[in-house]
Amino acid sequence: MNFGKKVWLIGNSSEKSKKTLNKLSKILKAEHFVFDDINPEIVISVGGDGTLLRAMHMYEYQLDRVRFLGVHTGHLGFYTDFTDEDLFEVVEALYDENPAQAIHYPLIRVQVSFTDGYQIVRHVLNEATIRRASKTMVGDVRISDYLFERFRGDGLSISTPTGSTAYNKSIGGAVVHPRVKAMQVAEIASLNNVVYRTLGSPMIVAEKDTITVCPAPEDDYSLTFDQLTFEYKNIKSIEFSLDGTTISFANCAHTPFWERVSKSFIGEVE
């Protein structure tokens, strides 16, 4: 009999994911796992990477005591180690799973400060972006205390090493191994001519540095925290840092990072 490990399942709306979640739930109940959505030990994501990101943000304020495990039911599951055909293997892995052997990935802390003194703090697993709704974004970019540049363009993306394979990669950023404790700044359609200049290439920023963006006072900024999008105005500054917060993945059938990258983007090498 299971020793009472507490789990919770989160799925997406596809029929395949619903069926997989239902089947896995029945297996786990038969094996006497405890279902707890308030204080789970392991959150099982059934779907794709978007589902895993949603699960992470649902438990964003419990990351110090929650581990995640992904079952993917689609075409691309960078954060998922199992498929919908591996459900009995999932149960076996949960029996054998040891919290001390969890895999940890760094998160970026994002602090948004407003002109009235109000602040919000979020953490992201993939990336955070800032852009304007329809016009050119203008903002000063500081690396720690140094004014690095005045950016003009569609926006900026700041990503984690694991997030470097997501939106960051699609806008020309580099792929960075999670062992490299750093943040990456990638420009979104920067404006470069004889009048206005930006660096024009991605930047890898060291662990101890902070990145601060001070946007011009406009009222139509769009900020994303992974897959979550918010509209803000009166933003004074946005500070990005690595504060030591991590997400923990159950080390059940963990696939090495470069193997994940190869399988996700290259496929079979002949």
From Swiss-Prot:
Disulfide bonds: none annotated. The active site is at residue 49. Coiled coil: none annotated. It comes from Lactococcus lactis subsp. lactis (strain IL1403). It comes from the Bacteria. NAD(+) binds at residues 49-50, 54, 126-127, 152, 154, 165-170, 189, 227. Its EC number is 2.7.1.23. This is NAD kinase. One of its GO terms (cellular component) is cytoplasm. InterPro entries: ATP-NAD_kinase_N (IPR017438), ATP-NAD_kinase_PpnK-typ_C (IPR017437), NAD/diacylglycerol_kinase_sf (IPR016064), NADK (IPR002504). Involved in the regulation of the intracellular balance of NAD and NADP, and is a key enzyme in the biosynthesis of NADP. Catalyzes specifically the phosphorylation on 2'-hydroxyl of the adenosine moiety of NAD to yield NADP. Belongs to the NAD kinase family. It catalyses: NAD(+) + ATP = ADP + NADP(+) + H(+). Its cofactor is a divalent metal cation. Keywords: ATP-binding, Cytoplasm, Kinase, NAD, NADP, Nucleotide-binding, Transferase. HAMAP family: NAD_kinase (MF_00361). GO terms for molecular function: ATP binding; metal ion binding; NAD binding; NAD+ kinase activity. It is an enzyme of class 2 (transferase). GO terms for biological process: NAD metabolic process; NADP biosynthetic process. It is found in: Cytoplasm. Pfam families: NAD_kinase, NAD_kinase_C.
